[in-house]
């Protein structure tokens, strides 16, 4: 576990009500496993507690962490307003992580912002036989399908994302 200053590489809208932040944090990326999370200190003096954020991806070779954050409250709204080049304090990796090594076929199931850690698990453990099933509020809220290493079926509450991607 490391407590480090991570540099924001990008911060952009990924889907409706969802922001993708890519951080440069080589020490954490080198240790991170699918299913783990980090604690982020909101970069202002008004927030004392760190925010737990699941890893959407951890690239040890590039030294990067990819996060999907829903800007709901003041803390996550501040995080989602970060600009490339800024630094934020990050503690991690935390949690036990997933263990899917050796599995022949895994069914991945997630919805909304909870798809982010599933994307990390798919990158680590998906096989040709694996399948993913995602649920979203609407098709505009959907993400995580275009680069999935296995077949993905996505559905939405309003029926606008009821197709195989």
Question: Where are each of the predicted segments found?
Answer:
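Ferredoxin-reductase
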Residues: 2-84
């Amino acid at each position: 576990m490391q407590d480090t200053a991570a540099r924001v590489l990008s911060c952009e809208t990924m889907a409706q009500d969802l922001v993708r932040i890519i951080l440069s944090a080589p020490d954490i990326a080198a240790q991170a496993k699918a299913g783990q999370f980090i604690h982020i200190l909101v970069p202002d003096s008004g927030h004392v507690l760190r925010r737990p954020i699941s890893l959407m991806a951890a690239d040890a070779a590039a030294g990067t962490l990819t996060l999907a954050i829903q800007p709901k409250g003041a803390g996550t709204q501040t995080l989602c307003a970060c600009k490339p080049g800024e630094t934020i304090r990050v503690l991690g990796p935390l949690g036990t992580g997933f263990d899917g090594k050796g599995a022949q076929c895994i069914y991945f199931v997630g919805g909304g912002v909870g798809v982010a850690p599933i994307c990390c698990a798919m990158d680590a453990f998906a096989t040709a036989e694996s399948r993913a099933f995602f649920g979203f509020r609407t098709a505009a809220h959907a993400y995580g399908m275009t680069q999935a290493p296995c077949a993905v079926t996505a559905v939405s509450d309003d029926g606008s994302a009821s197709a195989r991607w």
